[in-house]
Amino acid sequence: DECFSPGTFCGFKPGLCCSARCFSLFCISLEF
């Protein structure tokens, strides 16, 4: 499935972020 890289605009589709979650409309990496 197609997904967005961290830092990419995700709108209201958090499930499309690759190994990241949608925060403030952008994919944020879960790694710290």
Swiss-Prot record:
The modification 4-hydroxyproline is found at residues 6, 14. Disulfide bonds join 3-18, 10-22, 17-27. Its main location: secreted. One of its GO terms (molecular function) is toxin activity. Keywords: Disulfide bond, Hydroxylation, Ion channel impairing toxin, Knottin, Neurotoxin, Presynaptic neurotoxin, Secreted, Toxin, Voltage-gated sodium channel impairing toxin. Expressed by the venom duct. It is found in: Secreted. The presence of a 'disulfide through disulfide knot' structurally defines this protein as a knottin. Delta-conotoxins bind to site 6 of voltage-gated sodium channels (Nav) and inhibit the inactivation process. This toxin acts on Nav1.2/SCN2A, Nav1.3/SCN3A and Nav1.6/SCN8A (EC(50)=1.7 uM). This is Delta-conotoxin-like CnVID. It comes from Conus consors.
